[in-house]
Amino acid sequence: MTMGDDLWGWQNINGSPYLTCALLAPWPHAFFTRAFYPQLPEQLITYLDPQGKAFRVKQVHGDVTLTATEIGQTPLAPDSTHPPADGIISDAPHQGVWVASADCTPVLIGDLIGKRVAAIHAGWRGTKARIVPKTIDKFLALGSELKDLRVALGPAIAGEVYQVDPWVALEVGQSVQAVQKLATEEQQWDHLSTMVNPPVLPDAEPEKYRLDVRRINQLQLLELGFAQEQIAVAPHCTFQMEELFFSYRRTHTKEVQWSGIVSY
């Protein structure tokens, strides 16, 4: 994964590393690493904006994005102090929006003109359900313009190591409109595995494939009309970079790293 590698840079707080993306330079933001565990957004936001308020949700691998105001108006998830959703959009200054991840893709978005920001949790289920395009639709409904948005797809499990069943690869791939329009599954498989930077890769194990979920999200954005220059894809793999990131696929434990962005 090479596109936009130069847009990503390491920063540190008291020797603990975190990532930032040049596309999101106007906003305080961070893709925090495992070094910050077990700190929660309420603490992490103080590093980005001491005046900021943290907003988070109970992530459920769905396709719902709430505004910060809607978070306070939405019933809580069972056994949680937060409502169920997988995306948050700010609707006032100094709002930090946060997502947790440990292989799924953390997506941070900023609107250069409208000033609003978003954080999205996009695993394979949310990607299949097109949570990122649905969040973009919500930006547009709030008055944003596509050309003003900047999107960073943060550290996640890389396609080269993410083994999945065939039905998962195909159903996630079918969330790309160009794939969905093809008449047969054979044509869809061919498109997904032979296009430039293919999101579906072969696996040494029979009846298994490798799936690049970030690439699927990138393709969804490009189909909406985003320019390549509006999207940055992190060249970091949570599974392979054990010293920096938690990975559920690697350890099957529940530690997470947080990613957040603050409106201004």
From Swiss-Prot:
SUPFAM superfamilies recorded: CNF1/YfiH-like putative cysteine hydrolases
Keyword Oxidoreductase: yes
Documented EC number(s): 2.4.2.1, 3.5.4.4, 2.4.2.28
Keyword Ion transport: no
Catalytic reaction list: adenosine + phosphate = alpha-D-ribose 1-phosphate + adenine; S-methyl-5'-thioadenosine + phosphate = 5-(methylsulfanyl)-alpha-D-ribose 1-phosphate + adenine; inosine + phosphate = alpha-D-ribose 1-phosphate + hypoxanthine; adenosine + H2O + H(+) = inosine + NH4(+)
Binding site for Zn(2+): 61, 104, 121
Required co-factors: Cu(2+); Zn(2+)
Molecular function as annotated in GO: adenosine deaminase activity; copper ion binding; oxidoreductase activity; S-methyl-5-thioadenosine phosphorylase activity
Keywords noted in UniProt: Copper, Hydrolase, Metal-binding, Oxidoreductase, Transferase, Zinc
Subunit details: Homodimer.
Purpose of the protein: Purine nucleoside enzyme that catalyzes the phosphorolysis of adenosine and inosine nucleosides, yielding D-ribose 1-phosphate and the respective free bases, adenine and hypoxanthine. Also catalyzes the phosphorolysis of S-methyl-5'-thioadenosine into adenine and S-methyl-5-thio-alpha-D-ribose 1-phosphate. Also has adenosine deaminase activity.
Family note: Belongs to the purine nucleoside phosphorylase YfiH/LACC1 family.
Protein name in UniProt: Purine nucleoside phosphorylase slr1573
Organism name: Synechocystis sp. (strain ATCC 27184 / PCC 6803 / Kazusa)
